Amino acid sequence: MHLKFHTLSLNDSGPLLAESSVKPSQQQICDDILLLWREEPITDGLSVDLLYDKVMGRHPEWILDRTEFKNAVRNQHLDSNDERSLKVYNDFIDIPSFNDDYDAIIDKKTSSNVCVKNCKDGHKGRGLYALKDFVKDDLIFKESYPIVVVPSMERLTLMKMGKACSLCGGLLSHLSKHFIVVHSLDCDNCGGVWCSNECKNIDIGHNTLKHLHKSKINGIDSVAWGKFEKYCNDNVFVAAYSIGVIMALALIDKKNTDKIRKKFNLLSSVSQGIRINESDSTNIGGTFDASSGAMSNKDPEPIWKTSYELLKNAIPTTDELDMETYLSYIGRYNINQISDQMFFLPSLINHNCEPNVRFEVVSNKEIRVYARKNISAGQELLTNYINPLHGVKLRRRELRVNYGFLCHCDRCIKEIKRNNDVENENLSNSINNNGGLSVPNDSLLTRRKSSMRTARPDLSELLKTGQEFDLDIPENLSGKKNRRTSVRFVNQVTLAVEE
């Protein structure tokens, strides 16, 4: 029995308006392919011809012949198995070598079960290793705070209104005004409110950064800082804002200045300019810095320059901060951040598409690292930098664009071989007019789905530890990220029917 997929409109959906014919750019083609791979991971292994049919089924308004489509795919390296043709920038990444500085700043109370040392694979630099055996779901270690706690930029407006914690950004709807006043959780000089005494006590930058002062406090111009913060917020430039907060807190928190700077400088670094040059796509189907509020501007340099000048005005004492150093800080943030925060030890954990650890971030402040499977003493801890549900092409592309390297883990090699085998068998699948995928060869599709189930993490486990995969963040009409994860409701349903 052969099945094919039909896509039908729901009863209560209105008729679709006919769209004018358009000629898509190579960028649009690339973005739609990437979006398709995100929405339907099984299409990751389609041949170029079947991929063309699928994309054209999604965009009947496009004027695009098969040759133009193949050229776009080839130019963007979307179907290339020749690694020599793929751009990577791992050689440009500065990875500080292992030295005694790591041990000196590791909190032995919460991180005594791990150590930092150089990896056997020289390309990976240093890594984090287990000092004892762990069984699945064991807590390996935790970090109570990131290098500095960076307030959630997407909630800055709510913070000013006293509706979200001035430090962690947690919503305050569960706290009564009486409770806030009795426990002195409100600021005497502004509308800021904290969710707990813990957040209030560690928010030592609040007075300097949130209150206007006639003169510089701790070497920081509060008026200029407000302009820098507003510019970053308006342009969804999370990386620049985070770097600014880290630099400011390194000046304000004099007790921990050396520790803050040492932790920051021990993290891997690469210029954001290099990363931009090596990326192929930054629009809705793109993957570049998607987890940290990527800017879709074709020319980000004006935003870099303006934010740099505003930061220099806010912190005039940073004489050593030239434009190239600033861009290296931006790149450092983007390749190390976890949930918009820079945690030290977790940033040292290397990638594998079949990881043995998982993260749990609590209230933007604490991160806990658990064993995903049994781990032996001396074994390297490995995490997944990208969405584990994606197919091998999209996974490797996301790693290449965001982190500068191609993954050669066992899972990737296995899936690449499987895709090549499927393509070599010249599947006779075809795409119907509605964009559905007909499946005349049940055994091949069953084998592909079976191998996908085997290779990917258990879905129940992913749902239990939902920090490890994200809903895509859509863009609004202006092209800027709105930073709010959304669910898209569609007016169509797909079902399988017998031919």
From Swiss-Prot:
Principal subcellular localisation of the protein: nucleus
GO BP term (any one): negative regulation of gene expression, epigenetic
InterPro entries: SET_dom (IPR001214), SET_dom_sf (IPR046341)
Enzyme Commission number(s) of this protein: 2.1.1.-
UniProt-listed PROSITE patterns: SET
SUPFAM superfamilies in alphabetical order: SET domain (SSF82199)
Known catalytic reactions: L-lysyl-[histone] + S-adenosyl-L-methionine = N(6)-methyl-L-lysyl-[histone] + S-adenosyl-L-homocysteine + H(+)
GO cellular component, one term: nucleus
Residues making up the signal peptide according to the UniProt record: none
Cell compartments where the protein resides: Nucleus; Chromosome; Cytoplasm
Main enzyme class: transferase
Domain of life, source organism: Eukaryota
One Pfam family in the UniProt entry: SET
GO molecular function ontology, one term from the record: histone H4K20 methyltransferase activity
Domain SET: 112-386
Coiled coil regions, renumbered to chain: none
Keyword Transferase: yes
Keyword annotations from UniProtKB, A to Z: Chromosome, Cytoplasm, Methyltransferase, Nucleus, S-adenosyl-L-methionine, Transferase
Family: Belongs to the class V-like SAM-binding methyltransferase superfamily. Histone-lysine methyltransferase family. SET5 subfamily.
Free-text function comment from the UniProt entry: Histone methyltransferase that monomethylates 'Lys-5', 'Lys-8' and 'Lys-12' of histone H4 (H4K5me1, H4K8me1 and H4K12me1, respectively), thereby controlling gene expression and remodeling chromatin structures.
Protein known as: Histone-lysine N-methyltransferase SET5
